[in-house]
Amino acid sequence: MQRVIVLVVVALALVGLGWILWGPKGKAGLDPAQGARFALGSEGAPVTVVDFSNYLCGHCQNHALNVLPRLKAEYIDTGKVRYLFRDFPFPGQANVIRASEAAACAADQGRYYDYHEVLFRAASSWGNLEGSVLDRYLVDLAGQMGLDENAFAQCLASGKHRQGVLADQKLATDLGLTGTPTFFIAGEKRTGFLSYEEWKNLLDKALAEKK
């Protein structure tokens, strides 16, 4: 029995070593903020946050609906933080890629953040849709927000923002990211949901270091 236990421990150690040696790793020298297409806040803000999210991720939804509005009011709108959004659809999530394209089409009409929030609120309604049914739903959402539906539908049908979404996805992979949400807060990587209090501590510390 003792020999079996030792063998199991050794096997687990080897698995762990394999993960360390061959698991996902970020490529050196990559800037998570470089080329970000969507942002809130002043370009001159002392602290930058980069948010890699997925529209069907529950923790991302919790952050977007319950934490981000408070961060926006306290840190972003007051010029302390610049907040960058990046898409991180997982393999096989064609509907998340399409939703991300739709958010970019909303950005063309100046409403990225609003549509971003609505996608999270309505995730349970569109999460199982695909193809033309999904497109119709995404266009209807835009219309409910007062966007130009025809322009939005043409944008979505053109696929002109698809490469931007896929570029974000590739960057996330190249950075070695394995889960959502993942945040880079003044360059420091954090993965998983953070409460507002945790955000406040991290941002206040980062701001203090900039003084």
How should these model regions be labeled?
Residues 45, 50-143, 153, 173-178, ...:
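Structural alpha/beta surface segment adjacent to cysteine/selenocysteine redox centers
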Residues 38-40, 126, 190:
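Short clusters of hydrophobic/aromatic residues that line enzyme substrate/ligand-binding pockets
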Residues 30-47, 75:
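A short beta-strand-turn-helix
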Residues 27-31, 60-64, 161-163:
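A short linear-motif detector with a strong N-terminal bias
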Residues 1-20, 35, 52-54, 65-68, ...:
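C-terminal cap of thioredoxin/glutaredoxin-like
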Residues 19-28:
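Hydrophobic single-pass membrane-insertion segments
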Residues 28-31, 135, 199:
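Periplasmic c-type cytochrome electron-transfer domains
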